[in-house]
From Swiss-Prot:
Source organism of the structure: Francisella tularensis subsp. holarctica (strain LVS)
Gene3D superfamilies given in the database record: Glucose-6-phosphate isomerase like protein, domain 1, Helix hairpin bin
Membrane-traversing stretches: none
Similarity comment text for this entry: Belongs to the universal ribosomal protein uS2 family.
GO term, biological process aspect, one: translation
Record's keyword annotation contains Ribosomal protein: yes
Keyword set, alphabetical order: Ribonucleoprotein, Ribosomal protein
InterPro entries the record matches: Ribosomal_uS2, Ribosomal_uS2_bac/mit/plastid, Ribosomal_uS2_CS, Ribosomal_uS2_flav_dom_sf
Annotated protein name in UniProt: Small ribosomal subunit protein uS2
Amino acid sequence: MSLMKEMLSAGVHFGHKKAFWNPQMKEYIFGINHGVHIINLEKTVPLFQDAVNFVGKTVANGGKILFVGTKRQAQDIVEAEAKRCGMPFVSHRWLGGMLTNYKTVRQSIKRLAQLEKMREDGTLESLTKKEMLQNIRTIEKLEKVLGGIKEMGGLPDAIVVIDGNKEHIAIQEAQKLGIKVVAIVDTNSNPEGIDYIIPGNDDAVKSISFYMKKFADAVIDAQGLDRAVEAKADEAAQA
């Protein structure tokens, strides 16, 4: 199936009601159907291919991609696909400063690791019941917010965002730090400052699944390429 047909099947072309549009998205809109803007997939297809290729190249060069999707219908998909390709993710709440104040975030990640170790080795059980419950609640709270980035090990090389409007703080932080931004931008979104714009439906589960599967597949393919390059380098070193 062609990419265009896959997008049509996933409903990528359905935008928002005309009343909610952002005029900056005008060039990506094909028309209006029953008061809803229809996105021009002839524009989306090459832009999406560019974004997927960029993600693949970044990973092939040893880079990390941070997937961000905190809206209800994106949470499970973002988490599942990020885990499938071994990349960090934020799927519940974007903490202000998650990128721009990463030093502080890293301290919280260390705290989470310490508490998890205490739970595993039984240290928590030696505390009073009240202390143990407090620490368990802290683990749950930190895991929910930081669980997806606890193995990130530093700032990402790029972020992939499901909804440019919803995740505007994440985008602003990435821009401040010169981290490349890939974002799904619906007809109500502001495409300004986004490095790789993907005009498309950012609400439908089917559309979100389509994007995330393609990105995760690109990461997995690139990881194979990366390992092949490493293996060749090892062979050359041993020769």
